[in-house]
Amino acid sequence: MSLKPTVPMTTAGRGIAQADLAGRFVYKFDGNALRNNIVHRICGIGQFTLDAAGQLSGSHTSSGMPLQGSVKTGVLVGTYVLTGKMLLGSDASLGDAHIAFRSETPGLDSVDGKFCFAIAGAPDRLWLMSTGATIMGKPEPINIAELVIIEAIRIAGS
């Protein structure tokens, strides 16, 4: 008797094109970010639509709290509108994303985020990790030290 996995054991390889990633995805994320020299734990959920050319639009809700010191205001919760681009690399299994997270919550910053992503077996599941972030709308760029991992699952085709 031969056992075959239902999902390939390795990430997707050749044969995947940018247009194969088009569709609507839901995702969850969590990680840490340094703000005012204090580490904050952040997590959230959201959704995005990716078109055949890699244009991305969506929204998410996140929460965060400092991991040291007092929490005077409790958990910070914010909502964001997303716009950006996710482009598959030449090896057809890894790519890069550049996403603007525009805050809809007074007092919370908008962020320009950069990510590396991998196709996790098939184009219906993507893994992303942060590779850089900058606070938007300031006179000079303010880099954010953050480490975030995201898992996105396609719920509808293009």
Question: Model-found features: residue ranges?
Answer:
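Mature soluble binding/inhibitory domains
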Residues: M1-S158
